[in-house]
Amino acid sequence: MFGEKVPSSEFINRSEYRDKVLGCWTGKNIGGTLGAPMEGRREIFDVKFYVQDLKGKPAPNDDLDLQLIWLLAVEENGIYQVNERVLGEYWLSHITGPWNEYGVGKVNMANGLVPPLSGAFNNEQWKNSNGAWIRSEIWACLFPGAPDDALEFAWCDACVDHADDGIYAELFTTALESAAFVESDIRKLIDIALAKIPADCRVARSVGIAIREYEAGHDFKTARNAVVEDLSLIHI
């Protein structure tokens, strides 16, 4: 079903790189600000513009803030001195969020369980949650067009407070985002990212369903419902 597995080897110049990083960060800001008032709710919304009074400023967003902490770790240590334990130390020193998987990972680390144990122990409820893949862009931006290199750091990142599909989700998005610096074909990007995660994991299964629905000509709501229905069957 899935085709090409490697990105283009096209060279990216400094100007193009800067433009894509700016687009990545700005787009993330826009999406996070648009969705912030609806976070935690499960119904489908039809949002065409901001619903809050922003006074010209984006909403606070941990999806972005966490990535700035990772960038700080890279700047202070050098990229190849950063690993899961270093990221765990920066988490304890700089990140205050106590909720869900963030809180579990932080409590585990405070009690001496270093990553990757911090993301797996006593975390059955949240280990597959979305707190890791939402902070994956930084690794793609640091390794543009080099998904395999980016994945090493995405794993170190995700295992601080996730396990299993919570990690696979970040690997998927990181690979896709890194390859997107040199490849524009969306289907090729999806194929590249799928090749980096287990074919039988929930992330790959859900992406496959979304592709199937798209190829059948169904709209995004139908595709979304098909994914949700499949996940509900898994949990029965």
Which positions does each model-derived feature cover?
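Short, charged, surface-exposed loops that flank catalytic or proteolytic processing sites
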Residues: 78-84, 182-189, 219
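Conserved small/polar residues in nucleotide/adenosyl-binding loops
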Residues: 234-236
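An N-terminal structural lobe/cap that precedes and organizes the functional/catalytic core
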Residues: 6-67
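Small-residue-rich helix-loop
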Residues: 203-231
